[in-house]
Design a protein with these regions (language model features):
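Phosphate/nucleotide-binding beta-alpha loop and adjacent structural elements of enzyme active sites
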Residues: 1-156
Length: 156
């Protein structure tokens, strides 16, 4: 098992535990079933911890060019990006990143602006169309953001 971050070493992965009841009445419990996380701000009511190795993507030997990276790490996005910065700059892949304020308590714009600084534009999909994110509205319910290199030629 390996988790990506901005350092190499070991950490604890929090795994939400399933209720013994087959019938789910708590919506939050349904959410937590797929929400394992190494991010310290994520708190679960009922979980177990498992030691996992963490590594920077920059330190993983990759021989082929990378064209696409998907990141869904429940609040640990900036750490993964920092640990993958050289890989991202050298390959300039399309990035699909889930970013939600509820995981970090930080504004979504903080993560978006950080990624834009390394040469990307940010988009979200609405009605099967890529919409450029220039300024997010307060109540906008987007969480999957596409980051395309600024020089990306798109036929969309």
């Amino acid at each position: 098992n390996l988790a990506l971050s901005d350092t190499n070493g070991e950490t604890k992965l929090k795994l939400p535990l399933r209720s013994k009841s087959f019938f789910k009445t708590n919506i939050e419990e349904l959410y937590q079933l797929g929400a394992a996380s190494i991010h310290p701000n994520n708190q679960f009511d009922n979980f177990k911890e498992v030691k996992v190795e963490i590594k920077k993507l920059d330190d993983v030997k990759i021989v082929n060019k990378i064209g696409f990276i998907k990141i869904d790490v429940e609040g640990h996005e900036l750490e993964v990006i920092e640990g993958a910065k050289n890989t991202i700059i050298n390959n300039m892949p399309i990035l699909l990143i889930e970013i939600e304020k509820r995981h970090t308590k930080e504004p979504v714009e903080k993560s978006i602006n950080h990624i834009k600084k390394i040469g990307y534009e940010c988009y979200f999909v609405k009605n099967e169309e890529l919409i450029l994110v220039d300024k997010l509205k307060d109540k906008q319910l987007e969480n999957n953001y596409y980051f395309l290199p600024r020089n990306f030629k798109q036929d969309l």
